[in-house]
Amino acid sequence: MPAARLAIMADDTNYGSLGALAPNWSDGERNIDTDEIYKRFFEWVADVKGVEPWPHQEEAIMDLLAGDHVILNTPTGSGKSLVALGMHFAALCTGRRSYYTAPIKALVSEKFFDLVEVFGRENVGMITGDTHINADAPIICCTAEILANQALREGRHADVGCVAMDEFHYYGDSERGWAWQVPLLTLPNTQFLLMSATLGNVDAIADKLEDMTDTDVDIIADAPRPVPLTYEYTLDPLEKTVELAFGRGETPIYVVHFSQDAALETANALASTGVSSKEQRAAIAEAIKGTKFTTAFGKILQRLLRTGVGIHHAGMLPRYRRLVEQLAQQGLLPVICGTDTLGVGINVPIHSVVLTALTKFDGTKMRKLRAREFHQIAGRAGRMGFDTEGLVIAEGPEFEIENAKALAKAGNDPKKLKKVKRKKAPEGFVTWNENTFDKLIDATPETLVPHMKVTHSMVLNEVEQGGDARYRIDRLIDDSAQTPEQKERLHDRADEIFQTLFDTNVIETEDRDDGGKDYFMTVDMPDDFALDQPLSPFLLAALELLDLESENYALDVISMVEATLEDPKQVLRAQERQARDAAMIRMKEDGLDYDERMDRLQEITYPKPLEDMLQAAFDEYRHDVPWANDYWLSPKSVIRDMVETASDFTGYIARYNIARSEGTLLRYLSDAYRALARTVPLEKRNEQLRDIISWLRVVVRSIDSSLVDEWENAGAGTDASEAAANLAAPGAKQAVVEDRRGLTVLVRNAMFRRVQLMDLDKPDELGALDKDWGYGVHEWEDALDDFYDEHEYVNTDAKARSGELFILDDSKENSEHSWKVRQIIDDSDGDHDWAITGTVDLDTTQSSGEVVFFDYSVSN
């Protein structure tokens, strides 16, 4: 939890020790000279870090102190972070604001806490779009896009003294590379430290940066790898490869896959092969003793961890990923199966990397790994301070492994060898061999291909700066590293955007005495424009289309919010698959022939509530607000679906069979909660919508509280020190029920979900929900038989779900930490003589995100 971590830091004797060596920023103390900066910094490195810097680190910091730019193209584990620390310290000592940028929020957040630990919380801030902590601090951690937008808004006048750009190979990313190029072109007074282990040839970048800033650029690319690597290509089955490495003591092992499903499949296979010792398993059991594995995937993870096998990928809950990282850092996990997220910022010590393939699906096709991708992954092998070398193993293709197995079985018998039928690569299969592996080992990362774009938001950021925005946009394009053909297209795009902004009266110009033009806006830019929720202004406008008195108002607001959020693709695919399966059954029952079924099936997709109304409104909005053309709506129903079906997190995961994508769903729910809580005005919230927002907070917080804490302690305006103080405040969380409204909705939903399943006559699903408190399948079958002997059907309309039929007794909340609840069933005869009654375990319910009962009954 972020605030907790800050509180712990305050007790660390070395907390803020480097920041204490710098002049006081807020008091305007006198700057110190470079010799003294160098002396203080490296004395701190020796005394506090207890390490001796490598020559390339000293060289880089000396270059930075001399005022030069530095491109640090050195291997993984070669201490790039220490150089960045030196740059931040030098900036703090000379009265300059410094920035650290990274491609993903998780890395920004991690670096923020690292810097707080050494510089002190008053000296470090963080901006990630949805999070603002101490944004006026002398050291700012942010995503690359945040800095790029600031550079466009403020240009040469930006208060950006120096920037450490981590993972600079993103400069070559086709979608996001513009954000790494823009600051180099628009901040001529800023010093840059560009860092990555896989930059390739950077001469063109260095020349461009030197030309734009009239400052020398020093390239440091000859640092030796601290832990050398050895390479091995094998045709052994994966399980045997891991077994052999385990036997040779070459653990921990990270087995790299290029899909989440493949990672889990391997983890399950390895869990049964005995990859850990009895002592390791006992240590793991002790380490995870207090961990709650409450979700479906959590139970899978718990089983795997107890065998010594970890799993790590982006679809997991953040708390599960952190747990795996912590166990690995403690040396408790011999094997981790994961995806190639290993290559970006995962903090896991690894001795051996095993690549299960040398190809990957890039979103459009299968292709061989590029040199940069390979070295990003392979470079993680070898633990500095632990290993004398790291090991990188590549598995051959499955068909080649089968061939090798057959040949080995034949031995040296010529007759048997002759009978061996060699398998061939499947048709269309992109294959690889040992030569592929050797070429990747020897290859240097490809030269980064620059990317640039021009959007409405970029133009408006320039206009907001004042002066001749058109000249600066043209200059940005001309100065960019793009080809002449690309520049021509960018100029054409700029023409279109400026014309649109003029036609819609969003911008105007004034002639200057010197013959130039000043551009200015006729409308106010939203405060969070082009950050995490660029369509928030549209959402506010679209809310006016809804009737606050409508029965579906709250659900329609949710649909509007969902249309502005990023798609949780795995969840939507599962919805579509289930909808198509149900449609196929209906079409078969209706006697449709195969071809017609297939044609109709292609038209079926996941639910998109209010699609026509929203699209029409958005088209009109884009006419009046042209910068919205940079974005698009994506109607969907995840939150709404959960509300309408009274689903909790666990039930929704089970319903769509998406246990492997729990993290994806949770991140989406978290984004939805933030959007609802921050964007929808209080006067636009009716009672049902307030209930839903509270319920959503309870769901997200109970599954993984860090996602809510991070935003509420930071994004809502609380600075880091206040967050830590609030967290530690006596009595801050003494209440048995932290969020009464949200928890009440959670319980009501759980009870009504059972009513819905009664209506559908689903004893199997009801039994699965209630077996732990004495109502398994057989008990529910008996209850349903008795109910339907007396009544024809169950109502599930709004009246059946109303508060009149739900009774909550909280008299034992404080004494026994329980609620007595009763859901009256709205039967066909209106007798209301049947009810589901239970005693809710408040503590377990709030920590698990699903309702847990002490006792339970269904009766009349």
What are the functions of these language-model segments?
Residues 1-70, 275-306:
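Helicase-associated low-complexity/disordered flanking segments
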Residues 232-258, 265-268, 322-331:
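Conserved interdomain hinge at the start of the Helicase C-terminal
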Residues 310, 329-330, 413-416, 421-813, ...:
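Non-catalytic terminal extensions of ATP-dependent helicases
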Residues 826-860:
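Compact beta-sheet-dominated globular domain cores
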Residues 44, 50-228, 234, 252-277:
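Conserved P-loop/Walker A NTP-binding site and adjacent catalytic elements of P-loop NTPases
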